[in-house]
């Protein structure tokens, strides 16, 4: 579910550790709470499976974002670099169900012309998506991490996603898409640059 939320950090992050045993115990208790028998056939291995799945789904909590953007190239490039349609899967922190969609990430390199690898941008999206999230914060975290590491003249991030907490419960509106954006630097101060980037992002 999209909504306001705060986190301990944006572009900075203290790496945590996953507690497999504690996660398994929590899932077992949840099964008891909904009236199920966690020892019956079909559920006996569920706590371990769910814990392993959560470890993968929340892997972004256990990775330092600075380690992702660790490859730079001196290309003396001074125009927009844009990676579109990056698939993302994240988890709404309000209901712990999925939201999924795509991210479009663009930046104009700084005066030194340094760029990062295109795959690094996709990895950065994946890292921040693999946390308990709200879409607005996810969008800003991606933008702020690029600003911190690349010192670019401008950054623009647009995320489009469908939230299962709106589709399968509550208002039950499957197919509704939420769009969020974060702009930094030149894209925030220069309307023409922002419009050009958005045109490229929205062009199919």
UniProtKB/Swiss-Prot annotation:
Q: Name one GO biological process term.
A: tetrahydrofolate biosynthetic process
Q: Which domain of life is it from?
A: Bacteria
- Give yes or no: UniProt keyword Zinc: yes
A molecular function (GO) term: GTP binding
Q: What is its EC number?
A: 3.5.4.16
Q: Which reaction does it catalyse?
A: GTP + H2O = 7,8-dihydroneopterin 3'-triphosphate + formate + H(+)
Its pathway, per UniProt, is: Cofactor biosynthesis; 7,8-dihydroneopterin triphosphate biosynthesis; 7,8-dihydroneopterin triphosphate from GTP: step 1/1
One family from Pfam that matches here is GTP_cyclohydroI
Q: Where does Zn(2+) bind?
A: 92, 95, 165
Disulphide bond pairs? none
- List keywords of the entry alphabetically: Hydrolase, Metal-binding, One-carbon metabolism, Zinc
What InterPro entries does UniProt report for this protein, alphabetically? GTP-CH-I_C/QueF (IPR043133), GTP-CH-I_N (IPR043134), GTP_CycHdrlase_I (IPR001474), GTP_CycHdrlase_I_CS (IPR018234), GTP_CycHdrlase_I_dom (IPR020602)
Listed under GO cellular component are: cytoplasm
- Keyword Transmembrane helix attributed: no
In terms of PROSITE patterns, this protein maps to: GTP_CYCLOHYDROL_1_1, GTP_CYCLOHYDROL_1_2
What is annotated about its quaternary structure and interactions?
Homomer.
The family classification in the record reads: Belongs to the GTP cyclohydrolase I family.
**Protein name stated in the entry:** GTP cyclohydrolase 1
* Origin species: Mycolicibacterium paratuberculosis (strain ATCC BAA-968 / K-10) (Mycobacterium paratuberculosis)
């Amino acid at each position: 579910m999209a909504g306001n939320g705060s986190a301990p950090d944006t572009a900075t992050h203290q790496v945590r550790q996953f507690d497999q045993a504690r996660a398994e115990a929590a899932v077992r208790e949840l099964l008891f709470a909904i009236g199920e028998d966690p020892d019956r056939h079909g559920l006996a291995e569920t706590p371990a499976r769910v814990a392993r799945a959560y470890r993968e789904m929340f892997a972004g909590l256990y990775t330092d974002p600075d380690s992702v953007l660790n490859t730079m190239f001196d290309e003396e490039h001074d125009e927009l670099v844009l990676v579109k349609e990056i698939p993302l899967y994240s988890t709404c922190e309000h209901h712990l169900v999925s939201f999924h969609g795509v991210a479009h990430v663009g930046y104009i390199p700084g005066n030194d012309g340094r760029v990062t690898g295109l795959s690094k941008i996709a990895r950065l999206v994946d890292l921040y998506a693999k946390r308990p999230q709200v879409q607005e914060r996810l969008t800003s975290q991606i933008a702020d991490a690029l600003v911190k590491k690349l010192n670019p003249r401008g950054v623009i991030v647009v995320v489009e996603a469908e939230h299962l907490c709106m589709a399968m419960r509550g208002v039950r509106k499957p197919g509704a898409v939420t769009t969020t954006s974060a702009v930094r630097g030149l894209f925030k101060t220069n309307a023409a640059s922002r419009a050009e980037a958005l045109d490229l992002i929205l062009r199919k």
